[in-house]
A protein has these predicted regions:
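Solvent-exposed loop/turn and edge beta-strand elements of beta-rich ligand-binding domains
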Residues: 1-359
Length: 359
């Protein structure tokens, strides 16, 4: 109440609480037998909201007006609305990205004559670092009927209520949603990545009447960069007469994986065209595979060492590693078969006399 007096008699002092009301099941409440006077000013303020709702902080000031001598009391209807509390769901998306290149130099030594010897080639290693990912799209689905305290059904179980796309910082957020349980599932992976098909769950619960929108519920997802498996097989000529081909000669064979073009990382470093990335040896079954993590680009496979009895195969097998879509975890590339042939020589004889004259 505000200060109010009649004929010098103080009937209300400012701040007096005239009455407290609680709404019934129909949402109505009245002042009952509280004494209130025509001409006096009163303020109606909500002190406790219904469960699931944010308190209405807007108070309403009113005054009873004289309505004639035939009316014993005045009646005033005041509507006070409440908003159902809501919440937001945010996602953060991360994954390994091609951020740099590390160059590992050749081994350097000094021989017995003081000459500097260099062993092998410089190897370029792609560096992948976990980073925020943009462009991932998520679908938010109600896992139960979403019903507010007044009985209104805002979504049925299974209804899609929102879609989220991550920004350049890897974050995405829904609009305010009604309280309840939800499933968050990735439906589109960022370019270059494998979709994470595992759903995650979020529950927006009542956080008290002071909040119209409760704190955001955060969920994190991670994507794997699409990988590549580069396979090859080997055949080596066999010569039983000279015992070549059955004495583990394959153990001396090595293949290299090289960049066929400049491949540049996010930080500006690059693998130069012709740069060696990885070396492998043959398995006992004469097969080999490169499974190192690679950025998308063009490469070639080449034999770089073989047994001393064989001719080095100089053939280059070109490999293009392209993104094959979000449903493929590893791209399988078969380079086919590389063949080694035995080194052959020719012996020629010339017959001469004791004066070296041909006969």
């Amino acid at each position: 109440a505000e200060d109010f007096a009649i004929g010098g008699k103080q009937l209300h002092k400012k701040g007096d609480v005239i009455c407290k009301m609680t709404t019934d099941s129909t949402g109505h409440a009245d002042t009952g037998n509280a004494q209130m006077y025509v001409g006096a000013k009163y303020t109606l303020a909500e002190t406790k909201a219904a469960e699931g709702y944010a308190i209405n902080s807007d108070s309403k000031t009113f005054e009873f007006k004289f309505t004639g001598n035939s009316v014993s009391y005045s009646k005033l209807n005041i509507d006070v609305g409440n908003d159902s509390q809501k919440g937001k769901i945010s996602v953060y998306k991360s994954g390994d990205a091609f951020t740099g290149v590390t160059a590992m130099g050749s081994a350097i030594s000094v021989d017995e004559n003081g000459e500097i010897m260099e062993s092998g080639q410089t190897t370029y290693k792609p560096v992948f670092t976990e980073c925020a990912l943009s462009g991932a799209v998520f679908q938010v689905t109600a896992t139960e009927d979403i019903v507010t305290a007044d009985g209104t059904v805002h979504a049925k179980a299974g209804d899609v209520v929102a879609e989220i796309m991550t920004d350049e910082n890897g974050y995405g957020e829904t609009e305010p949603l009604y309280l309840g349980r939800y499933e968050v599932r990735e439906i589109k992976a960022p370019f270059g990545y494998v979709m994470n098909s595992e759903p995650k769950y979020a529950e927006l619960i009542y956080a008290g009447q002071e909040f119209e929108v409760r704190d955001t519920v955060d969920i994190e997802f991670e994507n794997e960069y699409q990988r590549v498996m580069i396979r090859l097989s080997k055949t080596m000529e066999n010569d039983e007469l000279f015992g070549i081909g059955s004495n583990g000669e394959y153990k001396n064979v090595r293949f290299g994986l090289f960049a066929a073009e400049d491949i540049t990382a996010a930080n500006g470093t690059s693998i130069p065209a012709g740069g060696l990335i990885s070396e492998i040896s043959l398995e006992e079954d004469m097969s080999a595979q490169f499974d190192t993590a690679l950025p998308f680009g063009k490469y070639y496979v080449q034999e770089i060492a073989t047994d001393e009895h064989y001719v080095l195969n100089g053939e280059k097998y070109l490999v293009t590693f392209e993104y094959m879509g979000q449903d493929i975890q590893t791209v399988d590339i078969d380079c086919g078969e590389f063949e080694n042939i035995i080194k052959r020589g020719r012996i020629e004889g010339h017959k001469t006399d004791d004066k070296s004259e041909p006969l």
